[in-house]
Regions:
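N-proximal low-complexity "stem/linker" segments adjacent to membrane-targeting elements
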Residues: 1-27
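Short beta-strand/loop segment that forms part of the nucleotide-sugar
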Residues: 36-45, 67-69
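Short aromatic/hydrophobic "clamp" motif used to bind/position activated sugar donors
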Residues: 95
């Protein structure tokens, strides 16, 4: 598939994030990308105004689709299930997993991704940098498993850090074909021991510190 035909389904999940939806979601919806794309938001049974905000935005953006995850089932990993629903609802071959708080800072981010993505990579991790984005391709899903298991692990509270995100593997989005998305989701919300987590952190740090030449840094307008 040529870059002129590549279309993306951007998928995110939200829970009680009405304010972030109002502030950040328009930036995802206002991408200037000629082939076309869609944004899919899966609401994890929010108790705030998230549903109302999504309904209002749908009136203005026909490429926004939202769906609702039923009430909690303690035996089910809700975030993983929410992304599964998003993938099933998607209509395009290329999938991007992200978070509403990871607002794109330019309107040409999708164009930059499409123009520079490695078609031979099974998945690509994306990092927001000061003047654009950095893409980190992986030949197989397994090669990226430590990165994904660490960032998407089960946590009661996630601390946001701003510095050295690439070096520590704190990516902002994942790009992959649809048939790889389910394999990626198998790495979400795992329980990892502190000892194993420390080993993963050190592995990612040294790999990314000395592997910068394997990435592409893109400066957007």
């Amino acid at each position: 598939m040529s870059k002129n035909e590549r279309r993306f389904s951007i998928i995110m999940t939200v829970y009680d994030q009405a304010g972030e939806l109002e502030e950040n979601l328009p930036a995802f919806l206002q991408q200037e990308y000629e082939p076309g794309y869609e944004v899919i938001v899966v609401d994890e049974s929010s108790t705030d105004r998230s549903g109302d905000v999504l309904k209002l935005l749908r009136n203005n953006y026909p490429h926004l689709y939202s769906t609702f995850l039923p009430k909690p089932n303690r035996l089910v990993s809700r975030r993983k299930l929410a992304f599964h629903l998003g993938v099933k609802a998607s209509k395009y071959e290329w999938i991007i997993f992200t978070k509403v708080e990871r607002k794109p800072e330019a309107t040409d981010i999708l164009t930059a991704i499409s123009d520079n993505i490695d078609d031979d990579a099974e998945l690509t991790l994306g990092y927001s940098v000061k003047k654009g984005i950095r893409l980190q391709p992986f030949s197989t899903c397994g090669e990226a498993s430590n990165h994904i298991r660490r960032i998407e692990r089960k946590l009661s509270k996630v601390r946001e850090r701003k510095r050295m995100n690439y070096t520590w593997g704190r990516y902002d989005f994942i790009v992959m074909r649809k048939d790889v998305a389910y394999e990626v989701l198998n790495l979400f919300e795992q329980n990892i021991s502190p000892t194993k987590m420390l080993a993963i952190r050190h592995h990612i740090f040294w790999k990314n510190l000395f592997g910068r030449s394997a990435t592409t840094k893109l400066v957007t307008q």
